[in-house]
Amino acid sequence: MDASSAPTVLVQLHGGLGNQLFQAAAGLALADRMGARLMVDLARFRDRSLRGYALAPLPVGAQIWPGGSPGMIERLRARFDKARGGKGVRRPPGWRGRVHAEPHYHYDPAFEALSGDLSGDVLIAGFFQSARYFAGRESLVRARFDASGAVSDHARACAARLAGEASVAVHIRRGDYVNDPRAAAVHGALTEDYYLRALDHVRAQAPHARVFVFSDDPAFAASCAARWGGESMAGASALDDLWLMSLCRRHVIANSSFSWWSAFLDPRPDAMVIAPVQWFAPAMMAKTRVEDVYPPHWLRM
């Protein structure tokens, strides 16, 4: 199938780097199965000043959908769809293909059926926060998300300290989890007890483990590192941190999509990953199935 006749998989991106990686990974896998070209729709970033397209430095291989924000007709169509119980996905101007809106947080088997129609363009919208959406294409995803060519010289200098079997990346998510009441109500920051139990488990298997603490709150990371017998580390950007954490031999992650990817991008099949059982705040956990966010070999605490 030549490029001119190939179908298009269009991914509607939103959120920060971690969210965008999940969305792009689902799109990459679907496009690969369909022999399709991958495109990304950036319209949702145009009216949100806090977030922007974060994947440009990576070799994702996606083209950007042309055009501006959805017009009046697209907005009315989305509102009508939402009123009828749909997800209210705004079609970008010029889109005439199918639309697949993720129906819920846990894995949706219907996603696999999208590749059955090899001739039809499809737009996907959602979070897609499970490795099951790109099962069998993990190597492709890791190759397209390889940040080694985009990180700073500072990160490369830090990388030398992470070499060896003893390195442990510990990630603490703060930011909006503690400063934004709405984000706190959905996610909730983890307690120190989780990290202490995780580090006890790590040190039981690796007594000489070297602990490196990463966070979007460097001062807090330094304080924790001092208490935990480790050291804080920070790259010059979020992409630096993602890459540096992926180099470590063991991973203690936060309840964060960004944190998730820092562990998943470590390609070693025997890498130890400890993840929190509390993926969301209690009220959100009560109504959300989260089992599919964890790869089978990850340890939950």
Predicted regions and their residues:
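Secretory-pathway luminal glycosyltransferase catalytic domains
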Residues: P7, G52-H201, Q205-A206
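A short, glycine/small-residue-rich beta-strand->loop->alpha-helix junction that serves as a flexible
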Residues: L13-F22
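Short catalytic/ligand-binding loop motif for oxyanion handling, primarily in non-cytosolic enzymes
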Residues: N19, D47-R51, R132-Y133, Y177-D180, ...
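Short amphipathic alpha-helix
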Residues: Q23-L30
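A short beta-strand-loop structural module common to alpha/beta enzyme folds
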Residues: A36-D47
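Short beta-strand segments
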Residues: V40-L42, A169-R173, R210-S215, A275
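Donor-binding and catalytic core of enzymes assembling or modifying cell-surface/extracellular glycoconjugates
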Residues: E192-M284, T288
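Leloir-type glycosyltransferase catalytic cores
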Residues: A281-M301
